[in-house]
């Protein structure tokens, strides 16, 4: 986090509950302080980022190799109460997260409020042929969306 603290996010209870665990100051082990989140919702692949003082988590459902809908949640603090907002993806195959799964959200260097959502597109029959999908996150009026784009460049962040 921007305060020097580190956290581990993991699913437990047969992948039904996501835990957020504060690590010790040396980042080597759990501190013993944790929260249970999305209880019974079976979420995985958390990609967490901070925007205007709020924490956002992009995540996927636990459906094995089968694609599913993404969800974004927001919290005022990383160990606080997370509120699910819904699917941020729009466009073709948005209900399947563009046949991909969240993996990371990359802040764009030199740009304020600019982020790239990174996804894994697993090919279960040939893992070596799996791909990545990178898409810009749009932020308008506090609403985050990830629209499908066949192609794009960094100019999208200048608008």
What spans do the regions from the language model cover?
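Carbohydrate-active catalytic/glycan-binding domains of CAZyme proteins
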Residues: 1-159
């Amino acid at each position: 986090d921007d305060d020097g603290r580190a956290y581990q996010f993991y699913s437990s209870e047969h992948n039904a509950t996501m835990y957020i665990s504060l690590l010790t100051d040396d980042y080597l082990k759990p501190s013993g302080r944790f929260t249970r989140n999305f209880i019974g919702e079976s979420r995985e692949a958390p990609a967490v980022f901070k925007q205007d003082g709020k924490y956002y988590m992009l995540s996927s459902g636990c459906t094995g190799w089968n694609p599913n809908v993404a969800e974004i949640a927001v919290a005022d603090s990383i160990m606080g109460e997370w509120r699910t907002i819904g699917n941020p993806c729009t466009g073709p195959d948005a209900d399947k997260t563009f046949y991909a799964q969240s993996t990371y959200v990359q802040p764009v260097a030199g740009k304020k409020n600019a982020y790239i959502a990174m996804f894994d597109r697993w090919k279960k029959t040939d893992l070596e042929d799996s791909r990545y999908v990178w898409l810009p996150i749009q932020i308008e009026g506090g609403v985050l969306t990830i629209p499908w784009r066949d192609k794009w460049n960094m100019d999208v962040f200048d608008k």
